[in-house]
C-alpha cells in the first residue's frame, strides 16, 4: 500500500481514539448537539479503523511467517510458506477494501430523497407505468424500512400517474436511490391493445436529496410567485371547498412546484417549499458535478431527462440496465421492489470509476 495512504489511515486511527475519548468527557455528554455529531463521526470512522487494524495484524503475521523461514525444521518452513501465502492474500483483500472505504463520500448520501416520476411518451400506458414504478419504489422503501410520503400527485385518466412526487425518509435513502434518475422505458402489450402488439412508453425519474434546514439555500420571497387553487385530487368534499392547493413558481429559474395532497394550505405550502429547495439545489449540484466530471463519466444520471438508463421488457421478462450493460431476466422480482439486484452492481461500478479517477489524480 502507498505510504501516503498508510499516513492517511494512521491519521484516521488517531482521530478515532480522540473522538472516543471525547465521547467519555462529561462536558461533551452535556452538550447533546456536539455529542450527536461526535457519535456520528465515530460510527463513520469505525469501519475503516477496523479494516486498518486488521491490515496491521496481517502485516505482523506476514513478518512472523518470514522469520519462521529461517528455522532449520523443514516442516516449520513449509508451514511458514503457507502462512506467508495466506497473509499476502489477506493483505491484498484488505487493501482493496480500504481503498473503497477511503473514497470521497457524497455528503448527501445519508439524506432523505425526493423521487419525481413523470409520464413521458406513450400516453395512458406511460401513466400506468409511472404508477408501476411508484409501487416498485414503495416496495423497495418498505424493504429498507424507509418512510414514504406523497408530496404531490396528478393521476392518469386510466390509472397510474401523469406525475407523482414522493419523499423517502430513512438512512441512506438518497445514496441508493440517486442511481434511479433518468429515462425508464417500458415495452409491453397494453390491456387495451386487441392485436397483441408491443408498445413502447417512457417515464422519467428524477431523484433529489432533501436539503436540511440548516443548509438550505436562501430563497428570496420576492423571487416567488404563489398561487392557490382548489385541489382536484382525492381527499373528500372538504378539499374542493377551499383553495388549499398551492403552486409556487421560482421566477429566476422558472421551476414550478404544486402540492395539493394535504387538506391544509399551510401544509401544502411547507411541502412545496421543501420540494422547491430540493429542485433548486439539484440544479446547483448538477452545475458543480458537470464541472467536476467533465473528464469522466458518471453513473448518477445528469439532469438530462432524455438519458435512457433502463428498459423493462415485459414479454421477455427482461430488465436491461444500459449504463453497465446489465441484463436480468427477473422483471417480476424487480417490479416487486428487488432493486438491489440492479443497484448493487451500479454502486460497484460507480466505486470502480471513483477509484480509477483517484488513481489518475495520484498519477
Swiss-Prot record:
Its GO CC terms? cytoplasm
Instruction: List compositional bias (Basic and acidic residues) regions by residue number.
Output: 284-296
Keywords (alphabetical) are: Cytoplasm, Methylation, Protein biosynthesis
Check the record and name the Pfam families matching this protein.
PCRF, RF-1
Q: In the record, which positions carry N5-methylglutamine?
A: 237
Classify the main location. Answer: cytoplasm
Task: Cite the post-translational modification comment.
Answer: Methylated by PrmC. Methylation increases the termination efficiency of RF1.
- Which GO molecular function annotation, any one, does this entry have? translation release factor activity, codon specific
Q: Where in the cell is it found?
A: Cytoplasm
Q: Enumerate the residue ranges of region (Disordered).
A: 284-305
Q: Which NCBIfam families match?
A: prfA (TIGR00019), PRK00591.1 (NF001859)
Function as written in the Swiss-Prot or TrEMBL entry: Peptide chain release factor 1 directs the termination of translation in response to the peptide chain termination codons UAG and UAA.
Say which family it is in.
Belongs to the prokaryotic/mitochondrial release factor family.
Question: Would you tell me the protein name for this molecule?
Answer: Peptide chain release factor 1
